């Protein structure tokens, strides 16, 4: 089973991103459980969307405490919550940031990092900082766990309040293309 925790802020589409990713994985024949994790947060407050998938039926309906992957659709959310809490060894981080890998502080459990300056792309496409579909493209590029084609099909099934289908398809593709993937080699303890 593979577990993903998506971090963002209220109003950025973290929950919608989880739903789109779940649909794309189902289209690829996976079993998926998606759990939005939010209460009465206001726009801008930290939110999370939780998703697990597998090749076989999933009976586990709990929160995700030890994710394989952390997808951050907001560059500042790590200042408000510990996005790395409980990550497994060999974890994947997919982060929206204009920073380089060397500028990030990563825990030793993180082995793969996908970086995408999604805010700049969002400002170009949407004229505001809505990064969810861009970061789904970044997730696909970084992990290889879902195809761009399945994400495109899932986006076509979605209902977007703030932007049109054409813009979101362009955002997905740009996120995929703009993502830099880094594998981190950690020295083995003696």
Could you describe each region identified by the protein language model?
Residues 1-190:
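Active-site cofactor/cluster-binding pocket
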């Amino acid at each position: 089973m593979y577990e993903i925790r998506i971090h963002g802020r209220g109003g950025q589409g973290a929950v919608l991103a989880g739903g789109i990713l779940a649909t794309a994985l189902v289209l690829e024949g996976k079993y998926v459980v998606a759990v939005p994790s939010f209460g009465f947060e206001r726009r801008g407050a930290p939110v999370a969307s939780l998703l697990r998938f597998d090749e076989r039926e999933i009976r586990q309906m709990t929160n995700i405490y030890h994710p394989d992957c952390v997808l951050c659709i907001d560059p500042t959310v790590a200042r408000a919550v510990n996005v790395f809490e409980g990550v497994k060894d060999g974890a994947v981080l997919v982060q929206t940031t204009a920073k380089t890998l060397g500028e990030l502080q990563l825990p030793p459990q993180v082995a793969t990092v996908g970086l995408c300056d999604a805010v700049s792309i969002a400002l170009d496409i949407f004229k505001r900082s809505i990064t969810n579909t861009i970061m789904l493209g970044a997730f696909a590029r970084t992990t290889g766990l879902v195809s761009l084609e399945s994400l495109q099909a899932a986006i076509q099934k979605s209902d977007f309040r703030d932007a049109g289908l054409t813009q979101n398809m362009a955002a997905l593709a740009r996120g995929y293309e703009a993502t830099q993937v880094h594998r981190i080699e950690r020295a083995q303890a003696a």
